[in-house]
Amino acid sequence: MKKIMLLLMTLLLVSLPLAQEAQADASVYSYQGIISHMAPPASPPAKPKTPVEKKNAAQIDQYIQGLDYDKNNILVYDGEAVKNVPPKAGYKEGNQYIVVEKKKKSINQNNADIQVINSLASLTYPGALVKANSELVENQPDVLPVKRDSVTLSIDLPGMVNHDNEIVVQNATKSNINDGVNTLVDRWNNKYSEEYPNISAKIDYDQEMAYSESQLVAKFGAAFKAVNNSLNVNFGAISEGKVQEEVINFKQIYYTVNVNEPTSPSRFFGKSVTKENLQALGVNAENPPAYISSVAYGRDIFVKLSTSSHSTRVKAAFDTAFKGKSVKGDTELENIIQNASFKAVIYGGSAKDEVEIIDGDLSKLRDILKQGANFDKKNPGVPIAYTTNFLKDNQLAVVKNNSEYIETTSKAYSDGKINLDHSGAYVARFNVTWDEVSYDANGNEVVEHKKWSENDKDKLAHFTTSIYLPGNARNINIHAKECTGLAWEWWRTVVDDRNLPLVKNRNVCIWGTTLYPAYSDTVDNPIK
């Protein structure tokens, strides 16, 4: 009997840990859904690996950490190379003479943030594994189709406590990650939005006067190519000096979702993934693995400002209009703004998730920028930018953009006139000469001497006339003399003004008597 009792007690003691282990397994399995909704740890818990899985992980870590590449030069965009600079040129346009000048310029920009537009949004999610290669530079990330382990996401919306801003995604596929992001946003909307009713978007904007597509791609990233299909920057007219355009990228960032850094490269892969799998997918030193470490969600606006003005203050006028500052009292800036237009391409900021294109005059621009300034349920964010880190060492992957381009500047010289007025008691003669400047095919200045057809002809009082001069007139000389009737000084000089600048209205008047002539030279509305 004692033996039987001893046997029963032994069986009971053995079965108790087995039951506890089975219960623990069931508990683990119950949390193997897509997303853990409990407060997650700082990094996702990992199941013990089998010997084969440990070997796979060790080989992956050794392979990726052994890849030899220069992180500063693997993501490089080399745009246009300018060999020949077109010469200076000039042409007549209405009542102005336009001088167009070209200069070789270069732009070198390091971009840690990569723009997202709607056509790429499906490829962009926090934690995505991509190759750091030319496709990433061109904003066409090559996502690695491998099985994934769990990742921890965090969001930077305010007020979230007790790890409410974090979530563990057990199987980091695109759909599961997106579900995780939506869960974080819903959690904030349900628990914290009433306490923080007006979350102002973080504002980030950059701007560049437009000269070539290569220049703007270097400035804003490869996404600009697709944006310009709607923006339609008129590079041809810009090159001819007929228009001036500026492109502004205005981001309203509602929130950013980050991915916890992996403690080792293998931590981002499913346990069945091998080094050979990665090699077969083309992962090597020329195509090292990287991951999308953060994604900014919000509203992204590209604005093109355009004017046919040849003023050198166009950029100042555009900047003033964009910032909503007053230009009252500055006639030149007022005229530029009143005669300028804009075109905006808007991504995000509405529940419809559509791309919006708006045209108008600059007075309406500020209203568009104010829309979507706050994050709420009516203004859901879309992916607008992302950053990538190298999986080897979690170092930031920066895209180096370089391009040369031709900067085109134009200057308008308005036509002017000289008004002659003779009311003196004598016979007078005028002599008016000037130079007209143009440019040959090589950009060399060509100077042609001109003179008034009525030079040195007798004029009796009261005589008036106007001599119209083109905008390229320079070195204006005005000479007037009067007949005194004196044998020893038959002609006396009244006016001898030389190398005068062209102005809108120059009034030269002579009067008086043969012995006491007089004159005046006044200017109305001088041309600046």
UniProtKB/Swiss-Prot annotation:
Q: Which gene encodes it?
A: ilo
Q: What is this protein called?
A: Ivanolysin
Motif stretch (Cholesterol binding): 514-515
Q: State the InterPro entries in the record.
A: Thiol_cytolys_C, Thiol_cytolys_C_sf, Thiol_cytolysin, Thiol_cytolysin_ab_sf, Thiol_cytolysin_sf
Q: Does the keyword Signal apply?
A: yes
Disulfide pattern: none
Q: Share an example GO biological-process annotation for this protein.
A: killing of cells of another organism
- Keywords assigned: Cytolysis, Hemolysis, Host membrane, Lipid-binding, Membrane, Secreted, Signal, Toxin, Transmembrane, Transmembrane beta strand, Virulence
Q: Which residues form the signal peptide?
A: 1-23
| Role played | A cholesterol-dependent toxin that causes cytolysis by forming pores in cholesterol containing host membranes. After binding to target membranes, the protein undergoes a major conformation change, leading to its insertion in the host membrane and formation of an oligomeric pore complex. Cholesterol is required for binding to host membranes, membrane insertion and pore formation; cholesterol binding is mediated by a Thr-Leu pair in the C-terminus. Can be reversibly inactivated by oxidation.
Highest taxon of the lineage = Bacteria
Provide the family line.
Answer: Belongs to the cholesterol-dependent cytolysin family.
Q: Does the keyword Membrane apply?
A: yes
Q: Record's Gene Ontology CC terms?
A: extracellular region; host cell membrane; membrane
Motif Conserved undecapeptide, which positions?
482-492
One Gene Ontology MF term: toxin activity
Assembly mode: Homooligomeric pore complex of 35 to 50 subunits; when inserted in the host membrane.
Question: Could you tell me the membrane topology recorded for this protein?
Answer: Multi-pass membrane protein
Task: Locate the transmembrane regions by residue number.
Answer: 213-226, 233-242, 311-320, 328-340
Recall the taxonomic lineage recorded for the source organism.
Bacteria, Bacillati, Bacillota, Bacilli, Bacillales
Compartments annotated for it: namely: Secreted; Host membrane
